[in-house]
Amino acid sequence: MNIAKKALVFTSVVAIAAGTSVSAKTRLSGAGASFPAKIYTRWFFDLAKSGGPRVNYQAVGSGSGRKAFIDQTVNFGASDDPMKDKDIAKVTRGLVQIPMVGGTIAFGYNYDCDLKLSQEKAVQVAMGMIKDWKELGCKPGKLTWTHRSDGSGTTKAFTNSMEAFSKTWTLGTGKSVKWPAGVGAKGNSGVAGVIQNTPGAIGYVNQSYIKGNVKAAALQNLSGEYVKPTVEAGAKALNGVTLDENLAGQNPNPTAKGAYPIACLLYTSPSPRD
């Protein structure tokens, strides 16, 4: 999508959030997912530069952002986990839930190994069942699982896929779960930071955090292919998502050939009466 189209989309979103026409004098605030924070920051910068409103977005996590929106302390919330009917009912001023962008969730790791994970092995890693890299076909070394410590839509999407991958997964799904092992960190940036600075660490992060010492594992899909979390592989996964009447949808283990198996849509939830 080019900058002009992005600006048009975001002008529409912020117009809903403001409940009126928008201009450079308009100031809006949003809070939520860290997953799309990088692209949102860029889009909001481009929007302001083109004469649109100034938007302050705080990447506090999907759970905190949703609460802030329900409590009416921000103009819009953002999440990688769409709002359900029970949460929508709490928004007395109404809302319009809009899927804005999609992305993949990578198994990011810091170790000298060309890592390929079957779906069963991926679940075992996330469950804290694997303690040494040799169990994954790599040279021996301590493996440190790294996870989110805050309420996170990334965690919700990740655990949805883990549950779809294998019956070995017993932690359930949600924006937070009781991890039996590992190191917790706040936000995608926090998890990526732990992995970056801890040789032998592995965890789940937005694909945009795959850089430096943080490499992405190739993950097995339902076609038996081992796929990296590329834009193309993510698009193939998201093409299979069917949206409901609230524009919400998910596909925790896509069947398409070439699809990366952990991908999700990212939503904003402005209010038309704010």
Residue ranges of each PLM-predicted region?
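Bacterial N-terminal signal peptides
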Residues: T11-A17
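N-terminal segment of the mature folded domain
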Residues: K25-K134, C138, A192-Q196, I202-G212, ...
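Ligand-binding pocket segment of bilobal, Venus flytrap-like solute-binding proteins
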Residues: R66, K156-T242
